[in-house]
Amino acid sequence: MEERGDSEPTPGCSGLGPGGVRGFGDGGGAPSWAPEDAWMGTHPKYLEMMELDIGDATQVYVAFLVYLDLMESKSWHEVNCVGLPELQLICLVGTEIEGEGLQTVVPTPITASLSHNRIREILKASRKLQGDPDLPMSFTLAIVESDSTIVYYKLTDGFMLPDPQNISLRR
């Protein structure tokens, strides 16, 4: 793979730096990944995320990495990408277990900063995406490190008791 030295923006993304991604990793050091040089750039889901025209290349890149992790490693079902233009976010909506309700996953690079107000806005938007107003407001934050490690945190509005089936007895 050849590293590109130009900084022309990719359609649908703003502010790309050398390597196709800006501001991801340690101190602005971008991965040497350029969509036109990699198989990712031709993947239908990546192209669908680019067409949303939300955020920059970093956001599309981390959303695509989380999509691949959910589909390939975690075996989620029917994961779709949804753009939230008012929040400038790409969200993933799918089901962890077939037949269960939709869950919202919000991919974010580790360098991003989230305020309480921003989290509240995302909670409200995720309720609309889940389609059931009776469910408690929640979403899963997928934090992507520069080495592609992904950590998932479930955020809810208030405290949630764990499922009894997920609690192991300790003596």
From Swiss-Prot:
Disordered: region residues: 1-35
Protein name: tRNA-splicing endonuclease subunit Sen15
GO cellular component: nucleolus; nucleoplasm
Gene: TSEN15
PANTHER family xref list: TRNA-SPLICING ENDONUCLEASE SUBUNIT SEN15
Compositional bias ranges of the Gly residues kind: 14-30
Clinical condition linked: Pontocerebellar hypoplasia 2F: A neurodevelopmental disorder characterized by progressive microcephaly, cognitive and motor delay, poor or absent speech, seizures, and spasticity. PCH2F inheritance is autosomal recessive.
GO molecular function, one term: nucleic acid binding
Family, as annotated: Belongs to the SEN15 family.
GO terms for biological process, alphabetical: mRNA processing; tRNA splicing, via endonucleolytic cleavage and ligation
Keywords attached to this entry: Disease variant, mRNA processing, Nucleus, Phosphoprotein, tRNA processing
Tissue specificity comment: Widely expressed. Highly expressed in testis and uterus.
UniProt entry tagged with the keyword Phosphoprotein: yes
Compartment annotation: Nucleus; Nucleus, Nucleolus
Domain of life: Eukaryota
Keyword Nucleus attributed: yes
Residues the record lists as Phosphoserine modifications: 7, 168
Function: Non-catalytic subunit of the tRNA-splicing endonuclease complex, a complex responsible for identification and cleavage of the splice sites in pre-tRNA. It cleaves pre-tRNA at the 5' and 3' splice sites to release the intron. The products are an intron and two tRNA half-molecules bearing 2',3' cyclic phosphate and 5'-OH termini. There are no conserved sequences at the splice sites, but the intron is invariably located at the same site in the gene, placing the splice sites an invariant distance from the constant structural features of the tRNA body.
Complex and partners: Homodimer. tRNA splicing endonuclease is a heterotetramer composed of TSEN2, TSEN15, TSEN34/LENG5 and TSEN54. tRNA splicing endonuclease complex also contains proteins of the Pre-mRNA 3' end processing machinery, such as CLP1, CPSF1, CPSF4 and CSTF2.
